[in-house]
From Swiss-Prot:
This is Large ribosomal subunit protein mL49. Component of the mitochondrial large ribosomal subunit (mt-LSU). Mature yeast 74S mitochondrial ribosomes consist of a small (37S) and a large (54S) subunit. The 37S small subunit contains a 15S ribosomal RNA (15S mt-rRNA) and 34 different proteins. The 54S large subunit contains a 21S rRNA (21S mt-rRNA) and 46 different proteins. Transmembrane segments: none annotated. Pfam families: Img2. Keywords: Mitochondrion, Ribonucleoprotein, Ribosomal protein, Transit peptide.
Amino acid sequence: MISSCVTRCFGRGKCLPGPATASIYQTIRCISTNSNKAAEAPIFPKLEDVKMHELIGNNNFGKKTYYVERSRTGNLPVYSAYKNGGNKIITEIRKIEGDVIQLRNDLQEQLPFIPKKSWSVVMQSKKIIIKGNAVEAVKRVLTKKF
């Protein structure tokens, strides 16, 4: 049945009036109309039947989740820096992947002795900056979690 369809399409030259893609489309159309069960089974499911968790690449990382990557030597990326000629000390947390705001909120709950006004987030570089020297306290909390 398929061979007769192909010879019928290509033998007379009716399927090759335009570009090659049109001839392939005509051949597939000719084959699919002559087969009994091919047209009944859909190739793709309906859009309403597809669930969100079934999609490839759907992971919820970054929504209320975060990860602090350690350095090559295994240390946490928590650093102190001196600004304004050494008058101002700040603590930086770097290498944050995911939700930076959620990490800041969780750290604020674990470290209530640091005022909330002292915390700031730099979204472009994904850093958390704390006014004052809180390196040891932050490392202690992050060591328990990571």
